Amino acid sequence: MYRFKKAEAEAEFEQIFRLNHAVFAGELCQYAADSSARLVDKFHDKNLYVIAVSDEEVVGMIAAHDRPPFSIVDRLPDPGVLEQFGRLIEVRLLAIDPAHRSGMVLAGLFLTLYQHVRTYDAVAISGRVEECPMYHRLGFHDLGPPVRSGQAEFVPMALRVADLARREPRWRRRLESVRGPMP
């Protein structure tokens, strides 16, 4: 059973840092491994974190922020392409513990994020090349070619919040069929 919520407690943030290290340093080799087994995002102070919790353990998270500079700019051939989207929020990080990688966790994270981004025009993300089909199913569209970072390649993408709104009822039904009503 999963709970999806905005991260607020220090213990939740500590678990987020450990999950980030496991995924981005250990699995994707984007960052050097650290003896503390923690990875704090450079935009931590301005990030909104939504999390998936199972048995009081953070097993998935999305970190997003709405204040430039956006890291996606470094992955775009023409950063001006972002101007078409109006008010933008960037998903900086998406990490899910490998033992919990399922459509349900991803849908729950994005549904929870949606509750916090309804007033924006678009969501930007740099998605791993291997995960592009999943992002495309979510409604994201490529903004440029893949760009290497560490041992992974990322594709800059965006999704209009109005498109996310159209997908919300389907995600909500899927989650409620498994875990009961969502707030």
Model-derived features: positions:
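Short amphipathic alpha-helix that is part of the acyltransferase structural core
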Residues: M1-L39, Y49-V53, V58-V59
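C-terminal "cap" of GNAT-fold acetyltransferases
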Residues: G150-V178
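Short, small/polar residue-rich loop motifs at catalytic or cofactor-binding pockets
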Residues: H44-K46
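Feature marks short, surface-exposed loop/turn motifs that line or immediately flank catalytic pockets
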Residues: D66-P68, E131, D163-A165
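Short, P/G- and charge-enriched loop/turn segments at secondary-structure junctions
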Residues: S36-V40, P77-G80
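Conserved beta-strand in the GNAT
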Residues: I51, E56-R67, I72, E90
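A short, polar/charged loop-to-alpha-helix boundary motif
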Residues: Y31, R67-G80
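Acyl-donor binding region in acyl/amide transferases
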Residues: R75-F154, L159-V161
